[in-house]
């Protein structure tokens, strides 16, 4: 039974969004039932669409019987998190061929790394890039060559942009494919000590660069719980990513098996022609509320107080910061992952990870269980963990309790009784603060306010 306050907030969002959501669903349903796809293309259109394909692929795509999957990729090899995507299109083509389907890269999007641009002029483009990514995804999908969508993207603005772009095609079956975090490097405490030593002039730039490089050291997502890893949590808790797939390291047998399973699931959804498993039906009011709850319970990135509002709007749903704040009153903080703890996401995954997060929240009535996902109706499936048996992914019962209470706790015994984000209002404006990363003695600060004209003045 869902918590009464969560039910009340969800119902209020539904009422507020009634007209816009209804229009969105009606348009998605019309497109789902009436889209002719490749059958509606002229011979000239179709010839252009598969000109670069092999002879066999041309015949299959032209026939229109087997699914043709469009990939939207945010690959570049500057972003460590996106480097694994370099080989994914060919890998997915192989899996699709085994399963009597074809794959084409429908389009590519920009992918910025805030870690590279922070403190630099390029950072001014970061938030704008989200909407460019959404447009880029939409352009790729507008060719009408595809029966479903596979998305390759992880980092800060990329996943929100891909979600917004995909939701513009709400009649499609879509799936998100994570790349996984890099293995753990030096500890976050050690990294902080190195930075402090540099700030105090005790070590030089060479030693600082070595410390940073020992932390960010290989392909995969950075291991702290920032926006990139919050994206992965959101995609899983909102039902757009395979259960247990978010935090599996790159270039492992399990990662490859999960990629193959993702292709199988997507093709199954396409062939079953289930409207309930299209992205526009998976991302409904309950899924959006679940995303906010996941963010609060895990102490995720404050950037999602912007992104979730935009994602929801793309699906005809209207949410506000007040919804975040009111949900925070009833959602406990159950994770301590850097920057609101010493552990990284690999430690979090080993402690029970997303399977346990969803289990303990569901058991306490703090998540909507009755939702559509890429693997069917109901979120309880996401409390299971993937195991590798004879090279195949098999789902088994997930952990019944946390394996490390200093990193992950039950909803009955949380780190904090209220969530990790708070909305602040005052005569200077409205803001959001990540309370999970603030020591309790600093929850109230009395000091003169300093007002700057622009961000450069702060520096």
PLM regions: where:
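Acidic/charged coordination and interface sites in well-structured regions
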Residues: 87
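N-terminal small/polar loop signature for handling phosphorylated ligands or for N-terminal nucleophile
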Residues: 106-144
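A short, small-residue-rich loop immediately preceding and capping a beta-strand
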Residues: 140-162, 173-178
């Amino acid at each position: 039974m869902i918590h009464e306050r969560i039910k009340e907030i969800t119902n209020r969002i539904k009422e507020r969004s009634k007209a816009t959501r209804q229009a969105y669903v009606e348009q998605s349903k019309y497109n789902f039932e009436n889209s002719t796809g490749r059958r509606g293309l002229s011979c000239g259109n179709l010839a252009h669409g598969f000109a670069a394909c092999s002879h066999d692929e041309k015949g299959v795509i032209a026939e229109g019987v087997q699914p043709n999957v469009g990939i939207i990729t945010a690959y570049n090899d500057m972003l460590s998190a996106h480097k694994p995507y370099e080989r994914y299109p060919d890998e997915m083509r192989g899996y699709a061929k085994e399963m009597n389907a074809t794959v084409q890269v429908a389009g590519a999007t920009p992918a910025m790394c805030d870690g590279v641009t922070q403190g630099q002029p390029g950072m001014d483009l970061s938030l704008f890039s989200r909407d460019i990514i959404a447009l880029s995804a939409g352009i790729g999908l507008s060719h009408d060559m595809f029966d479903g969508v596979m998305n390759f993207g992880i980092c800060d603005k990329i996943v929100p942009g891909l979600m917004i772009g995909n939701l513009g095609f709400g009649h499609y079956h879509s799936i998100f494919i994570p790349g996984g975090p890099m293995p753990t490097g030096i500890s976050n405490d050690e990294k902080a000590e190195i930075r402090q030593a540099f700030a105090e002039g005790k070590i030089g730039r060479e030693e600082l660069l070595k410390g940073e490089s020992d932390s960010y050291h290989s392909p995969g997502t950075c291991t702290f719980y920032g926006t990139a890893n919050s994206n992965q949590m959101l995609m899983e808790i909102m039902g757009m990513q395979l259960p247990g797939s978010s935090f599996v390291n790159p270039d492992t047998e399990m990662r490859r098996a999960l990629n193959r399973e993702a292709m199988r699931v997507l093709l199954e959804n396409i062939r079953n022609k289930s409207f309930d498993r299209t992205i526009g039906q998976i991302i409904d009011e309950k899924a959006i509320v679940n995303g906010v709850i996941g963010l609060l319970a895990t102490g995720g990135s404050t950037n999602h107080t912007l992104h979730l509002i935009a994602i929801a709007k793309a699906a005809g749903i209207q949410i506000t910061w007040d919804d975040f704040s009111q949900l925070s009153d009833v959602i406990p903080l159950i994770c301590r992952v850097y920057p609101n703890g010493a552990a990284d996401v690999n430690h979090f995954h080993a402690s029970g990870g997303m399977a346990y997060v969803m289990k303990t929240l569901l058991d306490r009535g703090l998540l909507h269980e009755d939702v559509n996902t890429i693997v069917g109706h109901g979120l309880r499936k996401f409390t299971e963990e993937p195991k590798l048996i004879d090279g195949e992914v098999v789902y088994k019962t997930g952990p019944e309790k946390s394996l490390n209470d200093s990193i992950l706790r039950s909803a009955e015994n949380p780190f904090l009784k209220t969530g990790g984000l708070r909305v602040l209002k005052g005569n200077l404006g409205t803001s959001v603060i990540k309370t999970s990363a603030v020591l309790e003695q600093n929850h109230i600060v009395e000091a003169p306010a300093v007002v700057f004209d622009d961000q450069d003045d702060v520096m």
